[in-house]
Regions:
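Active-site nucleotide/adenylate-binding loops and adjacent lid/helix of ATP-dependent enzymes
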Residues: 1-7, 11, 19, 73, ...
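ATP-binding N-terminal substructure of ATP-dependent carboxylate-amine bond-forming enzymes
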Residues: 1-110, 114-120, 139-155
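Hydrophobic beta-strand scaffold residues
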Residues: 35, 103-104, 132, 171, ...
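Glycine-rich phosphate/pyrophosphate-binding beta-alpha loops
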Residues: 85, 181, 236-239, 306-320
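Phosphate-binding site of ATP-dependent enzymes
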Residues: 185-272, 299-301
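Conserved metal-phosphate-binding beta-hairpin within the catalytic cores
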Residues: 211, 220-222, 278-311, 321
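Active-site "cap" helix and flanking loop/linker of ATP-utilizing ligase/carboxylase catalytic domains
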Residues: 235-287, 319-342
């Protein structure tokens, strides 16, 4: 079977994608799959890669530029888009593969784009009665002014007062369509707020502002198409105030714990809520569902779901699936099987 891995991409998570691809390529069973890799540069150019060290600076050495994308893609039996963030996890690459009529790993177009957009995902999760941390939607208009937008689309220019009144400080400012904690900032005071909002808006003109809670970060992996299975719950042990990009991929002092150090009843609730959230976006294939456990109140909140979670050797999704009995080679087999079933 001819398997194509696609990595890189134009998002801020370009480097993470390449690290994930290294791990998937290493673990894909070469007796089952003829594995090739296409790399997408930050400028959006596609290359047929020769080097297998996709995370190195020389990853394009010896590569051939791909100009006829459809013809190239249609030469494969299945595609694994190992792409995170915009132009990869947001339904765009999925739409291209749908048009080319090629089976691919992961969620389809609508689930991908909805889950990637924190603002619209929150609306769906509200409809599914899944608790979430109190939040506000801030938009940077095309005239560069910031406004708070309510559920009926009404705009308020009193951004600082709205956030201070409804959420208070500290709070978190998050670019709506960014992942791996890129464009995510903790704001401790009113004087920090506007600069951080503008910084987040550099990644996405749509921004979510959430109330900060004294939280333990918990994660659950789901897998399946019609029949969804959920892993045990894992716990993030960040080296710092919250799980930043650096904590996830660069800080060796950050750690994970499986199972999480919370009551079994909390873990059972999270596993059920993870499946519910995955179904709410009509997910297929896989996702990592992220939750907050409020240490002060005991409440559990859904943070977000990631439809193409990190696959590095330290990423939580493959760790959770290994704990569930699927090591990375077997996990790749199962994800490809699910892709071919659709």
């Amino acid at each position: 079977m001819k398997l194509l891995l696609v990595c890189g991409g134009q998002s801020t998570e370009h480097a993470v994608s390449r690290m994930s691809c290294v791990n998937i390529y290493k673990n894909a069973d070469k007796t089952k799959y003829d594995v090739k890799v296409a790399g997408i540069t930050k400028e959006g150019e596609w290359y047929d890669l020769v080097s297998t060290d996709f995370s190195s600076d020389n990853w394009l050495e010896g590569a051939t530029k791909i100009t006829d994308h459809f013809t190239f893609l249609k030469s494969f039996d299945v595609v694994f888009p190992v792409l995170h963030g915009q132009f990869g996890e947001d339904g765009t690459i999925q739409g291209l593969l749908e048009m080319a009529q090629i089976p691919y790993v992961g969620c389809r177009v609508m689930a991908s784009c909805t889950a990637m957009d924190k603002i619209y995902a929150k609306k769906l999760f509200d409809q599914a009665n899944i608790p979430q941390v109190p939040s506000l939607y801030v938009k940077k208009r095309y005239d560069d002014k910031l406004v708070v937008v309510d559920d009926e689309g009404r705009e308020s220019f009193n951004v600082e007062m709205e956030i201070y009144t409804h959420l208070g400080f500290p709070c978190f400012v998050k670019a709506s369509r960014s992942g791996s904690s890129v464009g995510c900032y903790k704001v401790n005071s009113l004087t920090e707020l506007l600069p951080r909002l503008h910084e987040a808006a550099n990644y996405d003109r749509h921004v979510v502002v959430e109330k900060a809670i004294n939280a333990t970060e918990l994660e659950c992996a789901v897998i399946g198409n019609d029949d969804i299975s959920a892993s045990r719950v894992g716990q993030i042990l960040p080296h710092g105030e919250f799980y930043t990009y650096e904590s996830k991929y660069e800080d060796e002092q950050s750690a994970t714990c499986i199972p999480a150090k919370v009551d079994q009843s909390i873990q059972d609730y999270i596993r059920q809520a993870a499946v519910k959230a995955f179904k709410a976006v009509d997910g297929t294939g896989l996702a990592r569902c992220d939750f907050f456990y409020d240490n002060d109140t005991g409440n559990v909140y859904l943070n977000e779901i990631n439809t193409m979670p990190g696959f590095t050797n330290i990423s939580m999704y493959p760790q959770l699936m290994k704990d569930a009995g699927l090591d990375t080679p077997a996990l790749i087999d199962e994800l490809i099987k699910l892709a071919l079933q659709r």
